[in-house]
């Protein structure tokens, strides 16, 4: 059962800035395994490129047989064949196999998981780093989304001016993601200010390597701290549980739905809040992730909303709440 794959360039509607970079386009890899759809959106930050993804897909292509009965076993076999730093490659294969498996059962993935899609929390819509005027314009354009996630982390002074202006413009639920861009003293000052602005939580305030800083910040923070870059897979959670209030799970960094489900179980055992997030992705990966929505507290599944040329259609939003099609598999079809 060969893996068919193709590279697709996602064009962003607007330049998308985070603390580390600004992008106008993103290359992803779409795969098809016997009618099962998957997607890889690789990140150099986690050790992958388009070339490593396509090379690794070719290496395992002939190892996937069409007659598998036990999906967890099959995904485990494929994981063992891939290099360690191949999370988005594994994620693409993982979601394609779930798509095949649930199509054979003629049920959507959420029914296989055993959850009610109506119980998904509302998703945030992300405002990337830009000039204050442009960020305020983006807030206006996002009128239909009740929860906004604001990207910060390049300059703490400018960050707080932007947040003050955004809060003056809207009373929506606001979340902040610094992508590890602040130093400890900056983070303390910023979080104090953000608490006054009634921000819900702050995501990854410090660099993932600043463990001592994160431990100190956890003790004094006036807002809940959600960790993203520190938490890649389930085994990372026990190491970080003592200095965060919650975690951000992404299929592209953990390796797919199977590992995401393990992460949810481990995080709950440690009493942590859970968010399902995303990279810039098409509706293939976003919709696959949305099936996990009823299991978590927060969603940030807007990657497909930031692109102008999504080649697939699947989950949509109504007042910020995911609406997952009642279709077999991961509930995605090519856009007409």
Language-model segments: which ranges?
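Flexible C-terminal active-site loop/helix
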Residues: 1-12, 23-28, 279-336
